[in-house]
Structure formats: C-alpha cells, structure tokens
Regions:
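Mature extracytoplasmic/periplasmic domains
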Residues: 267, 299, 303-382
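Extracytoplasmic "Venus flytrap"/periplasmic binding protein-like
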Residues: 50-120, 151-162, 248-258, 268, ...
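Glycine-centered hinge/linker elements that transmit conformational signals in sensory
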Residues: 171-173, 211-241
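Extracytoplasmic/periplasmic solute-binding protein
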Residues: 131-139, 144, 168-213, 219, ...
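Hinge/lid segment of periplasmic solute-binding proteins
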Residues: 91-143, 168, 196, 278-282, ...
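Extracytoplasmic/periplasmic substrate-recognition and gating elements
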Residues: 49, 53-54, 59, 156, ...
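Short, solvent-exposed loop/beta-turn-alpha elements that line the ligand-binding surface or hinge
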Residues: 107-120, 177-179, 202-222, 271-272, ...
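C-terminal capping/gating helix-and-loop segments adjacent to ligand/active sites or protein-protein/ligand interfaces
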Residues: 129, 295, 358-412
Length: 422
C-alpha cells in the first residue's frame, strides 16, 4: 500500500504557492479529513460544529473513512488534486507525504504563535518534524512503560525511574521472596533493544534505513544475556507462559508482576482483566547518555501544502490542541493533550485510569526523562523483528548460549534484510 501511495504522490504532486485566506474575516470553507471509528466520527463532527459556532465565517466540510480505506482515499485525492485543507496524518506515513510536498511547513506559524505549542514538550513536537521542520502537530501522546500489579508487590519499593541494575535487583528480590517473575527483560519485544541502544545515543535503524543504527554487536549481546540470565536464574517469566503474559492473563493470575505496554492500553487492560495496575518508566542502562523513552504521537493533524485557506486550517488545529472543549467533546480518543496546561486542567475530571496515565506522562515530561522520537521504522522492520524473536526464543529455551556470536550473526542477517528491503 505504501509503495502504491508513494508512486501516486511522486507522479501527481505539483507544488504551488497557496493564496491564504484570512481565518478571521473572510468567508472560509474548510475541508477536514480523518479516519476512525463511528464514535470518533460523531465526536469530531460535533467538534467541527462547535468550531463553526465560535468562528461564524467558517464553514467546515467533513470527510472520513475507516483506517483500511483511508490511505487509498487520501492518495486518490492527491492524484485528483482534491485534497482537504486539514489532514489527519499517521507517523508511519509522515515522511512519505512531507517529502513529496503534500504537507505544509508549519514553522512560520509556530514562530508567530499562531500554532501555539509553547506548553508542549519539545520531544512531542519533534515527532512531527521532517527534514528539521514541523509538518504535523500531534493530537495526543502515549509512551511505553512498565506496567505492574501493586497488589503482588505490596511492601516493596518500585521507583518510577530505575537503572537496569536496580530493576534486576528488585526482580531477584521479588523472585526470592515471593516467586514472582517479570516479562520485560525476559521477553521477545524488540523495543527492549530499541530502548537500550537509544540510552547510548543510537537509534535502532540508521538514517537511510538500510541497516541497524549501530555497529557494536555487544549491545545486542547484552540484551540476549539479560534474557538468558533471567530465565536461567528463574526471575524471568517461563517462556511457556510468555504468550499469556502478552494479554495480561498471567499478571492477573500472579505469574508475573511486570510487563511492557503502552500507556493508552491501561484502560482496556484494567477493565478487561479486573485488576488495578500502576506504571513506571522502563529501566535505563546504568551508564546511559540520554533518556530512551519517547512520547509517541497517537496521530497528527497536518495542513495541505496546496490549501487555499492555510490560516484557517492552522487555526482549526490550534483550537483542537489548546481548547478544553476539544477534550470535553472528543475525550482522549486521539491521545492525551499535548498541552501541559490543558492536561492539568482536565486531569481532575479524568477517570482513575486516565489520571494514572496523565500522572506518568506529566512526570516524564517535567523531569526530562524523555528524548525526541526516532524516525518511523523501515518497511523491513517487521522481518527484522520476527528474526529477533526467533533468536530470543532459542535463548529462552537454552538453544543459544554464546550470546556474542549470536548477536553478530543476528546483526549480519538484520542488515541484509534492511538493505534488501530498502
């Protein structure tokens, strides 16, 4: 699908200068496009009506589609020169649409304060950048965290921020005292490796996405060793139960006390499993040079480069991210507010789950425990992740014990996949 979209963009996109209409005085017709569920359609439509009421000169034409149809629809609109003014954008497609000239550069609007992102963390805004400039404004954020069951670890201190050494010491203590295991260091999720190399200033993939973003295989060997050691010593979740842990059934049953998940999964996880959970940051390398955690945009709003009403389009997005009524109508369907002021004002009215999510996101931002998000993953990343999972499984079952040799072999194969995939 991405290759088809890219071809359409390359063949049909002709750059032009937009004649910008005033968002304040002249009659404006603003076209807005998004994807999502029926609930999102209903709430966003209601928000558009509110915007029209507060901006009498603006008439909004809405358009939406399911995710499965959205990108074909958008590519068709590009080829037919019928793009909307405001486009809901996804992180995986941002580079493609920005580099093909479909999206407007928003730097001048941010500099002028017309797109007010002054209360958003720099790392959040950076997620909407391409080639050093902002082309998309995040609608909301989430982050990878360690979720744990406080009922299982009552009486033990679980700090919000831990080094690997501190985390492993806690895991060993909980296993020795209560027989509890964990499924972060023992698991097969490649985000463990991503976070580890980010701690040392690298990214998982290189800039042109033709190889891994680092050359020292010892970084991979370290992660392999964590898996092997945790299983061998018992404090890592038995691999036979790993699949169950992914759906939280094992944390509910008490087989493991901690697992890796996104913050926006808390509501469904607690409700679906009837358990109250807490969240802390993922452990960091003992000698880390930067925080590994990043705020991932739930999705974005972008402005079409060829829009004739860019001022109005920018004002609509600014209204969305900075007006409390947005979230009163739409809730946190598109993620938690990027504005710390809006988030703070809304938090008292949040559900218990949303208050916990807000607390960890706010704390990470306030304490500087995040860094800018990496570029979106290459096409071959799924194959690389599967390959990584194969190696982890063999380590979990004791079929691989020479971690350095296995790491070097994995690196070679991963680079071959990435080079071919490009």
């Amino acid at each position: 699908m991405k290759k088809l979209v890219s071809l359409l963009l390359a063949l049909t996109m002709i750059l032009s200068m937009a004649v910008i209409a005033s968002a304040e005085d002249e009659p404006v017709t603003l076209k807005v496009l998004w994807w999502g569920s029926q609930t999102r359609h209903d709430t966003t439509t209601a928000l558009c009506k509110l915007y029209e009421e507060t901006h009498p000169n603006v008439k909004i034409e809405i358009d939406y589609a399911a995710w499965s149809d959205y990108w074909t629809k958008l590519a068709t609109q590009v080829s037919g020169d019928t793009l909307p003014d405001v486009i809901q954008m996804d992180y995986g497609y941002l580079t493609q649409y920005a580099e093909n000239g479909v999206l407007a550069n928003l730097d001048e609007y941010i500099a002028a304060g017309r797109m007010d992102v002054s209360n958003a963390a720099e790392s959040i805004i950076a997620s909407g950048k391409w080639n050093g400039s902002v082309y998309a404004i995040p609608t909301g954020t989430n982050a990878l965290v360690l979720m744990y069951n406080p009922a299982l670890v009552e009486g033990y201190d679980v700090p919000t921020y831990m080094t690997y050494e501190e985390y492993i010491d806690l895991c060993k203590q909980l296993y020795a005292d209560k027989g509890l295991t964990e499924n972060y260091l023992a698991g097969a999720d490649m985000n463990r490796l991503r976070f580890y190399v980010r701690n040392y200033g690298y990214e998982l993939y290189n800039e042109d996405q033709t190889a891994l973003g680092f050359t020292d295989a010892q970084l991979i060997a370290d992660q392999f060793e964590y898996v092997g050691t945790s299983i061998k010593e018992g404090w890592g979740l038995n691999p036979a139960k790993s699949v169950a842990a992914d759906t939280f059934s094992s944390i509910t049953a008490g087989d493991t006390w901690a697992v890796l998940h996104w913050t926006n999964e808390l509501n469904a996880t607690e409700t679906g499993n009837g358990v109250s959970l807490q969240m802390v940051a993922l452990p960091a390398a003992d000698d880390a040079v930067r925080p590994a955690t990043f705020f991932k945009p739930s999705m974005f709003w972008s402005v079409a480069e060829k829009s004739q009403v860019k001022d109005a389009a920018v004002d609509f997005i600014n209204f969305y991210i900075n007006d409390l009524r947005t979230y009163e109508i739409c809730g946190t369907d598109r993620g938690f507010p990027i504005s710390s002021v809006v988030l703070e004002a809304l938090t008292p009215g949040f559900s218990e789950q949303n208050q916990k999510i807000a607390a960890i996101l706010n704390d990470m931002a306030a304490t500087g425990n995040t860094s800018p998000i990496m570029p979106s993953d290459p096409t071959a990343s799924a194959e690389v992740s599967d390959l990584y999972g194969d190696y982890i499984e063999k380590i979990q079952y004791g079929q691989i014990t020479d971690y350095k040799a296995a790491a070097e072999e994995f690196m070679e194969k991963a680079n071959e996949l990435l080079s071919a995939g490009k």
